[in-house]
């Protein structure tokens, strides 16, 4: 299968848009101002194991995302498959499988009540999304939210993120298409440093929204063990053991969401939101004490460990 994004070598310095101080750009994905030239694949696109085919334009349609494996997800409500008015189709960012990408959230298997409550927080402004969820939530009806929540709650989670400890990663950029981080064509490698870099395991399949092709999260060496200590024990009083509320396996308890196997960028964004007050929902009262003493390195380590589970 040809790659949908066929890049030509680029010898241009990429300039990131300004980031809010204290928020790491590896977690808060902002498209680079300069983008590499791309040539979209012409004709029908296929992915392994699926009888379906789509054009590049259909794959990128935010009002009708591809359903590569309809038997795995069942019939989706209209709000998930097509959106409504200014409301994008939920499946365009979260995928019809619910697994999402680095810039969105993995909703598969979360409780419907939790999703409904989260959408209410976006609607009211109690939870501020750095991108688009507040604007999406406001015009949605209670019935649309309920249907979307029940759909994503019915999906099977797991097996989406592979974590690898390393010192070196490919040079990357954040695409304007979907705000995905992708390898910079011809860019070589660079030190990872104090970052987590998430990339599709297969670029062509990832940019085609293939729900069977997940992500690899490159994390600093030693970060998973450090995160394990913080998550399991609270790090000698620095924080509170996550399993108390999220379950020993981090798969969630009741309406408390799972954090196991989530995109580390997403987990980090939520911890920063609790720290900075951009999430001042009811649940933030519990999380404030959890995040109060966490450093940037702690948040990175927790995100790395949670993703590895």
Language-model segments: what does each one mean?
Residues 2-8:
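Sec-dependent signal peptide recognition
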Residues 19-88, 92, 128-241, 276-309:
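Flexible coil segments in periplasmic/lumen-exposed cytochrome c-class electron-transfer proteins
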Residues 91, 108, 243, 257-260:
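Cys/His/Pro-rich metal-binding microdomains
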Residues 9-18:
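Hydrophobic h-region of N-terminal signal peptides that target proteins for export
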Residues 99-100, 251-252:
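Short, non-ligating residues that shape and space the ligands of small metal-coordination modules
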């Amino acid at each position: 299968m040809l790659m949908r994004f066929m890049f030509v070598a680029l010898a241009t310095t990429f300039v990131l848009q300004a980031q809010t101080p204290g928020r790491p750009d590896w977690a808060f994905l902002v498209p680079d101002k300069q983008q590499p030239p791309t040539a979209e694949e012409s004709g029908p696109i296929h992915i392994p194991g699926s009888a379906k085919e789509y054009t590049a334009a259909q794959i990128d349609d935010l009002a009708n995302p591809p359903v590569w494996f309809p038997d795995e997800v069942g019939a989706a409500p209209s709000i998930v498959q097509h959106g409504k008015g200014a409301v994008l189709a939920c499946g365009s960012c979260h995928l019809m499988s619910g697994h999402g990408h680095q810039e969105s959230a993995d909703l598969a298997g979360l409780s419907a009540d939790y999703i409904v409550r989260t959408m209410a927080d976006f609607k009211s402004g109690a939870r501020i999304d750095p991108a688009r969820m507040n604007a999406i939530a406001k015009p949605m009806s209670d019935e649309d939210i309920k249907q979307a929540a029940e759909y994503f709650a019915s999906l099977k989670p797991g097996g989406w993120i592979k974590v690898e400890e390393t010192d070196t990663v490919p040079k990357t950029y954040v695409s304007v298409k979907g705000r995905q981080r992708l390898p910079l064509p011809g860019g070589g490698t660079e030190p990872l440093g104090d970052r987590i870099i998430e990339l599709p395991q297969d670029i062509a399949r990832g940019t085609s929204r293939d729900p069977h092709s997940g992500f690899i999260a490159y994390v600093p060496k030693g970060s998973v063990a450090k995160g394990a200590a913080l998550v399991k024990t609270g790090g000698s009083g620095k924080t509170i053991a996550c399993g108390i509320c999220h379950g020993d396996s981090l798969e969630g308890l009741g309406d408390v969401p799972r954090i196991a196997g989530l995109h580390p960028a997403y987990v980090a964004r939520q911890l920063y939101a609790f720290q900075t007050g951009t999430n001042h929902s009811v649940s933030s009262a519990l999380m404030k004490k959890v995040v109060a003493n966490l450093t940037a390195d702690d948040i990175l380590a927790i995100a790395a460990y949670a993703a590895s589970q």
